[in-house]
């Protein structure tokens, strides 16, 4: 539950910071 959902936003935030 929320596996993806949690990984999707996490990866998006890191891509914007990097």
From Swiss-Prot:
EC class name: hydrolase
Gene Ontology terms, MF aspect: aspartic-type endopeptidase activity
Subcellular localization: Secreted
Family: Belongs to the peptidase A1 family.
Biological process (GO), any one: proteolysis
Keyword Electron transport appears in the UniProt entry: no
Keyword terms, alphabetized: Aspartyl protease, Glycoprotein, Hydrolase, Protease, Secreted
Name of the protein described by the UniProt record: Pregnancy-associated glycoprotein 55
Superkingdom as given in the UniProt entry: Eukaryota
Main subcellular location of this protein, as a coarse class: secreted
Post-translational changes noted in the entry: Glycosylated.
Its EC number(s): 3.4.23.-
Source organism of the structure: Ovis aries
GO cellular component, one term: extracellular region
């Amino acid at each position: 539950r929320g596996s993806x959902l949690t990984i999707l936003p996490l990866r998006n935030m890191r891509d914007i910071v990097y």
